[in-house]
């Protein structure tokens, strides 16, 4: 098991209930896409899974360690096994790209090696290899504030590829990329997770990226799970209901103009196709 959430709720300090009664289980090696409108709770859900936030109620378990035992040492050990891709990577602008990538293993290295690597990169070949996978090898020694938003996102992905964690949590990892590059990058992440037997949970705005690349889809709306289904059982009416607050148009990447024609039009079509 990678994680288990049982009736998890999360209320922020301002009183806003971001998550309400979330129950979710992921076995090792699953690839799950979180979809839903802005403000649905996807980022909060990923934050709980990454131990950045502790549930207000309910129970969260990550790698068989439940939140009652999330002390400093336990959290440090868990985070060494978790890789997070942020929508806006928290990378200092003056930091070199090579250092940002190597930071992926700071939690796995002894303290002396982590400190030394911040001064002088200790695994330049490893960082270069990770950057090559996202077509940024030429930026190895560039400063991070010289990069575009899309390039910074790819540096964040290279850091996770270098880290090789057991659980990857990706929060809108390709939001700043053009459609073709977004598709290639999502395929890179899913292929890496599949090859290593790692668990991947990614929140995505574009439903075609989610349905076309992830076997399991979790729809999140107003802090609750609206549905949790194999991708082939998600129907057009389900998607429209999920995104009703954002208008009639579903969020779809431009590289899949005929995407909706491949999605079951209703539940009956889904049952006929899947059962």
From Swiss-Prot:
UniProt-annotated location(s): Cell inner membrane
PROSITE patterns per the UniProt record, alphabetical: ABC_TRANSPORTER_1 (PS00211), ABC_TRANSPORTER_2 (PS50893), PHNC (PS51249)
Residues involved in ATP binding: 36-43
Protein name: Phosphonates import ATP-binding protein PhnC
SMART domains with a match to the protein in the record: AAA
Family membership: Belongs to the ABC transporter superfamily. Phosphonates importer (TC 3.A.1.9.1) family.
Pfam family, one: ABC_tran
Superkingdom of this protein's organism: Bacteria
């Amino acid at each position: 098991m990678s994680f288990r959430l049982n009736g998890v709720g999360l209320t922020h300090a301002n009183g806003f209930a971001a998550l309400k009664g979330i129950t979710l289980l992921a076995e090792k090696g699953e690839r799950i896409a979180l979809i839903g409108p802005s403000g649905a709770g996807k980022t909060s859900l990923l934050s709980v899974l990454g131990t950045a936030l502790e549930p207000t109620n309910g129970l969260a378990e990550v790698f068989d360690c439940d939140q009652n035992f999330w002390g400093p040492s336990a959290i440090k050990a868990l985070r060494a096994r978790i890789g997070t891709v942020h929508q806006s990577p928290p990378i200092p602008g003056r930091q070199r790209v090579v250092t940002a990538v190597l930071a992926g293993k700071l939690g796995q290295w002894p303290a002396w090696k982590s400190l030394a690597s911040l001064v002088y990169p200790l695994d330049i070949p490893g960082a270069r290899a990770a950057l090559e996978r996202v077509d940024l090898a030429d930026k190895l020694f560039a400063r991070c504030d010289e990069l575009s938003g899309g390039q910074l996102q790819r540096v964040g992905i290279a850091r996770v590829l270098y880290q090789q964690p057991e659980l990857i949590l990706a929060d809108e990892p390709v939001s700043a990329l053009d459609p073709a590059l977004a598709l290639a990058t999502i395929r890179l992440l899913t292929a890496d997770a599949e090859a290593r037997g790692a668990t991947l949970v990614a929140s995505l705005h574009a439903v075609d990226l989610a349905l076309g690349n992830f076997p399991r889809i979790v729809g999140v709306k107003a802090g609750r799970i609206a549905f949790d289904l194999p991708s082939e059982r998600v129907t057009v009416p389900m998607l429209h209901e999920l995104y009703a607050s954002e208008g009639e148009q579903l969020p779809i990447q431009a590289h899949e103009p005929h995407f909706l024609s491949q999605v079951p039009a209703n539940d009956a079509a889904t049952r006929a196709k899947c059962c």
